[in-house]
Amino acid sequence: MARKCEITGKKTMFGNNVPRKGLAKKKGGARQHIGVKTKRTFKVNLINKKFFIPDLGRSINIKVSANALRSISKIGLDAFLKKNCKKIENFL
């Protein structure tokens, strides 16, 4: 299965590694030298989590990002799914 949050749709992003040497001028240094940029990936912090749905009387397993899990713990699963225009039936 893909490395993707099933609720928010967050997935791996791509960017650059930027190596920096030296002290910046505003911090009292001569200058800061930036080396060769190389490609890198930013992976999503995914967690396999089991949620109990009292309306259905059963549990569902969802792969969620840590950020989404924080929001779910604050406002609840039903409210978070409604906010992201998802339905519980999609995860059964």
Swiss-Prot record:
InterPro entries: Ribosomal_bL28 (IPR026569), Ribosomal_bL28/bL31-like_sf (IPR034704), Ribosomal_bL28_bact-type (IPR001383), Ribosomal_bL28_sf (IPR037147). The keyword Ribosomal protein applies. The lineage of its organism: Bacteria, Pseudomonadati, Spirochaetota, Spirochaetia, Spirochaetales. This is Large ribosomal subunit protein bL28. Transmembrane segments: none annotated. GO terms for molecular function: structural constituent of ribosome. GO terms for biological process: translation. One of its GO terms (cellular component) is ribonucleoprotein complex. Belongs to the bacterial ribosomal protein bL28 family. Keywords: Ribonucleoprotein, Ribosomal protein. It comes from the Bacteria. NCBIfam families: L28. HAMAP family: Ribosomal_bL28.
